[in-house]
Regions:
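Hydrophobic/small/kink-forming positions within alpha-helical transmembrane segments
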Residues: 19, 23, 74-79, 83, ...
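Glycine-/small-residue-enriched transmembrane alpha-helix faces in small-molecule transporters
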Residues: 1-38, 44, 83, 87, ...
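Cytoplasmic-side transmembrane-helix entry/capping segments in multi-pass membrane proteins
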Residues: 11, 63-73, 119-131, 149-152, ...
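Specific transmembrane alpha-helical segments of multi-pass solute transporters/efflux pumps
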Residues: 17-22, 49-97, 101, 130, ...
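Helix-helix packing/entry segments at the starts of transmembrane helices
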Residues: 11-15, 39, 96-103, 164-188, ...
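Specific alpha-helical transmembrane segments that line the substrate/conduction pathway
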Residues: 35-46, 76-78, 82-119, 152-155, ...
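Juxtamembrane helix-entry segments on the extracytoplasmic side of multipass membrane proteins
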Residues: 3-7, 30-38, 62-67, 140-161, ...
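Hydrophobic transmembrane alpha-helices of multi-pass small-molecule transport proteins
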Residues: 48, 103, 120-140, 157, ...
Length: 317
């Protein structure tokens, strides 16, 4: 089995899980959005921190730089992303938002290597363009105002920050802690934003159906997917891991069809096939070279953690 097979499978699983949130979120459409995200992250943080404690990982002393990075990650990649996304839906169609945010593979393919003082690999950039094209075909292009596009770009920036701000933290803290700490920090940020935008009416108990949906989102789409993503990010690097972000529409499509909420159209299937082709192009390893034809510069493992998966509670993003 290739050394990249396991992290690649983890990245694919993470993005497919994130994609399922689209259909599941339809069941909580009447719940205040930002407060709901705070509830989801609180559940995920509780699970991840419990796993950290159960595994008795060595203490990792946080420097001021670590704390600032964690706060920035929570503020931009989690809270900021959700705020921009919610506001964007008021000024642009879901297709526009999906197409803009779907450019994440290209951005990571270009910016990821630059953060490591390397030139972007032409093959990975080309693969990212193919993946983004596939995501755009699946999402459609829709319509929206300039403000909606700008807000969508803000959500895209949050997605980029979610990965790039984690890179310097992963060698020291490992994927479990990097998934857990920002999730916990984002909870008060989202609660405050929810109260500011919707008032105290945003604070209410979920119905039983909503509670089940939040349980799924918190346990699988957040706790599990975040861990899998950060583990893959550490082992594949931002450019190659970013290719798998194109699988989000595929996850949404499968869940929508499975739940009987819609049917798979020609554009959906074509987009998924294009995304798959782009991922395969990006994962193909040139003979006798590193992953991108250069020295392999993946993020080293944390001495505090191995790659054990997150234990999941029975029926526990």
């Amino acid at each position: 089995m290739s050394s990249s097979t396991v992290p690649a499978a983890g990245a694919a699983a993470a993005m497919l899980l994130v994609g399922t949130s689209t259909a599941v979120s339809a069941t909580i459409a009447d719940y205040p959005v930002l407060s709901g995200q705070a509830l989801r992250y609180a559940l995920a943080a509780a699970i991840l921190l419990a796993v950290v404690r159960h595994r008795r990982l060595p203490r990792a002393g946080l420097t001021y730089r670590d704390v600032l990075l964690l706060l920035a990650l929570a503020a931009t990649g989690l809270a900021g992303f959700n705020i921009f996304l919610v506001e964007a839906t008021r000024h642009a169609s879901p297709a526009v938002i999906g197409t803009v945010v779907g450019a994440i593979p290209i951005v990571l393919a270009l910016v990821g290597p630059l953060t490591e003082r390397r030139r972007p690999a032409a093959r990975i950039v080309g693969a990212a363009v193919v993946v983004t094209l596939g995501a755009a075909v699946a999402a459609g292009f829709g319509g929206g105002s300039l403000r909606g596009v700008l807000l969508s770009l803000g959500a895209l920036a949050g997605e980029v920050a979610f990965s790039l701000l984690a890179l310097p933290l992963l060698p020291k803290l490992g994927p479990l802690r990097v998934a857990a700490y920002p999730a916990a920090l984002a909870v008060p940020m989202l609660l405050a934003a929810g109260i500011a935008l919707d008032g105290t009416s945003s604070l209410r108990l979920p119905t039983p159906t909503e509670a089940v949906a939040f349980g799924y989102l918190g346990v699988l789409v957040t706790a599990t997917a975040f861990f899998l993503w950060y583990d893959a990010l550490r082992r594949l690097g931002a450019a190659r891991a970013g290719l798998f972000a194109g699988l989000v529409p595929a996850g949404a499509l499968v869940t929508t069809v499975a739940l009987g909420l819609g049917e798979a159209g020609v554009a959906d299937v074509a987009g998924a096939l294009i995304v798959g082709a782009g991922v395969l192009i990006g994962l193909r390893q040139p003979a006798q070279t590193g992953l991108d034809g250069q020295a392999d510069r993946r993020v080293p493992r944390s001495p505090a953690e191995d790659e054990q998966p997150v234990p999941t509670a029975p029926e526990r993003q």
